[in-house]
Amino acid sequence: MMLMMLPFIGSVSVSESLVAMTTVCLVYLILKFFQTEIPEGLRRLPGPKPLPIIGNVLEMGSRPYLSLTAMSKRYGNVFQIQIGMRPVVVLSGSETVRQALIKQGDDFAGRPDLYSFRFINEGKSLAFSTDKAGIWRARRKLAYSALRSFATLEGTTPEYSCVLEEHVCKEGEYLIKQLNTAMTADGSFDPFRHIVVSVANVICGMCFGRRYDHDDQELVGLVTLSDEFGRVVGSGNPADFIPILQYLPSATMKNFLRINGRFTEFVQKIVTEHYTTFDKDNIRDITDSLIDHCEDRKLDENSNVQMSDEKIVGIVNDLFGAGFDTVSTALSWSVMYLVAHPEIQERLYQEIEDKVGLDRMPLLSDKPNLPFLEAFILEILRHSSFLPFTIPHCTTKDTSLNGYFIPKDTCVFINQWQINHDPEMWKDPSSFNPDRFLSADGSEVNKLDGEKVMAFGMGKRRCIGEVIARNEVYLFLAILIQKLHFLPIPGEKLDMTPEYGLTMKHKRCHLKATMRARNEH
């Protein structure tokens, strides 16, 4: 989302040409900016003064969510920065963001036409697409309907209420065995390494109806690709913000295209197989559900927007990538917080022992009876804020917010980290305290406080897989806490410093775990 550095240009003549051309572009943009008429009664956006060509990149540093939070204290909840040659409006504060994304949702529902966005899922991405409103809404409705249909699919045996529950319970049980094996062989384990593969398997099961061995090269390759995608997108593509760089060779862009090509090739192969074996009376997974809804749309003469089969590949690709990365990151952070706060880990175990027992696995139906676990997950999402920004938004027309004029096609950043750490909303926001979400007697979660946490976006672009993701995180965690006691390695300090990216990961480390004895309490 930001420029980390400008690419090195070796030839002096090329450098001089680049400077000259970018200077011309810069002068043009500056003149255009100052020629923009501000409607009567509205104000020009405040913000730091940009440097020529690179804008405010240097002020953003390696942790832009912190830098932009600091700027919001100086300039307010609506201000403008410049990244390269592109003006960007930054929104902070829960009420301001709610006003923009919900009350003025249509005005801020676009996606900026960033150069790199054109190549994500070959331009067919639901999350990153700059499609016109009607087309985008039709695709979103299709994806949402498919997810809703999938959520009602029953498990293969009566003990599971749905397919999601079956996938997570089976994979959770296998994950515990894998961690025990690692403990026996090595005395410790890398939590992210094992969690990420287990979550990928659940996503593969839900999207594609298949499960892999943890050392399967295709699965390991997908995990690696997803990690690379997060790093590349998180570090930013200079061509998104300095347009002339689109025409110059770029190692970053070459790698970006390679990653997207591999993902698309993998999903295209599976979608093709699903078309070959599709049976409308036997919906097996999300891909089948998408095909089913897509076929219904083709038969609907009243449908204004027909959906091409290629769009299914883009939607499946989005659901796989987003669901896999978000859930695995949430779970790995959760384990880190369990180790960092042993007293909280014991309270969670006690709650599960009291409300679920130790003779069966926790299920989705147990969720209302485990308020402290729900509060713990909410505090993970708030305190870590591992999704510091939403995917950038874009204004669809000239608009205003908090009295400031914002032109059409302006790129907009939503600072979720600031909202989740705003001292005006949260008492002692830097402290990790799940109890902040509980009622006075601890018997239930305060829903209004829980809704203040921003992790999945808001409004028309809110993540459509949020409910599935939350249920998956809950169920995985309940299973792990019921069976395992997570511990640090003696003498090693736990480093909770996030590493910036599209999703912020904790630094890779090793932990220990022991099986819970049934008579432990």
From Swiss-Prot:
Catalytic activity, reaction form: an organic molecule + reduced [NADPH--hemoprotein reductase] + O2 = an alcohol + oxidized [NADPH--hemoprotein reductase] + H2O + H(+)
Keyword line: Endoplasmic reticulum, Heme, Iron, Membrane, Metal-binding, Microsome, Monooxygenase, Oxidoreductase
GO BP terms in the entry: hormone biosynthetic process; progesterone metabolic process
Membrane topology, record value: Peripheral membrane protein
Pfam families cross-referenced by the UniProt entry: p450 (PF00067)
Gene Ontology CC: endoplasmic reticulum membrane
UniProt cross-references to InterPro entries, sorted A to Z: Cyt_P450, Cyt_P450_CS, Cyt_P450_E_grp-I, Cyt_P450_E_grp-I_CYP1, Cyt_P450_sf
Cellular compartments annotated: Endoplasmic reticulum membrane; Microsome membrane
Enzyme Commission number, as recorded: 1.14.14.1
Residue ranges crossing the lipid bilayer per the database entry: none
A single MF term (Gene Ontology): iron ion binding
Residues binding heme, per UniProt: C463
List of residues binding substrate: F229
Needed cofactors: heme
Entry's family note: Belongs to the cytochrome P450 family.
Protein's job: Cytochromes P450 are a group of heme-thiolate monooxygenases. They oxidize a variety of structurally unrelated compounds, including steroids, fatty acids, and xenobiotics.
UniProt-recorded name of the protein: Cytochrome P450 1A1
Naturally occurring in which organism (per UniProt): Limanda limanda (Common dab)
Gene: cyp1a1
